[in-house]
Amino acid sequence: MKRWNFSNVMLIVGLLFIYLPMLILVIYSFNASKLVTVWGGWSVKWYVGLLDNTQLVSSVGRSLEIAFYTAFSSVLLGTLAAFVLTRIPRFRGRTLFGGMVTAPLVMPEVITGLSLLLLFVAMAQLIGWPQERGIVTIWIAHTSFCSSYVAVVVSARLRELDLSIEEAAMDLGAKPWKVFLLITIPMIAPSLAAGGMMSFALSLDDLVLASFVSGPGSTTLPMEVFSAVR
């Protein structure tokens, strides 16, 4: 019989600490009673009422749409930034560029949201766009910080690649774009998928940035839930 050592015990405690509250939340979502401390039996009336709330259902669809757009654009921009940082060792402004790519990772979301709000207001006054804040401005705001996560993930993968494989393909006559599409992309595909899923989750979970750059009729799910709880 396998002994319970300290590592196994701490692993189980950590997993329970993370997942037990989620399990309790799911179970109590079927509670017929309005009180959390009183169990009134199993019921799905809260889920039926949720589907009847058209405003909440609309915010779910809107959040999923924004998250999908954010994941796609973040993977694209983050991958390009990662290639620049890993494949071009020296160029003027490299330190500044690297700092700008990773800045959203450490910058408070309140500062980022306020800065983007001021930017959108100034752009509307100068060039007339955006005329109003909505899904597009939320998408831009989410992409601005999700791209940093993708860049970090993809950069780590690119640094581990064996460049001799790409060099061998080019020695055999393959064009750089063909090497990129047929060799590099398949090798970094797991990191692209991880970055895309991370961007999707971050966009779906964001409340602060969306609160700054959203407008009438563009309420996301976190904003709707926060408003209901408050």
Segments from the language model and where they lie:
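Hydrophobic alpha-helical transmembrane segments of multipass integral membrane proteins
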Residues: 57, 61, 65-77, 81, ...
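A structural signal for multi-pass alpha-helical bundles of membrane permease subunits
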Residues: 19-34, 62, 113-127, 197-202, ...
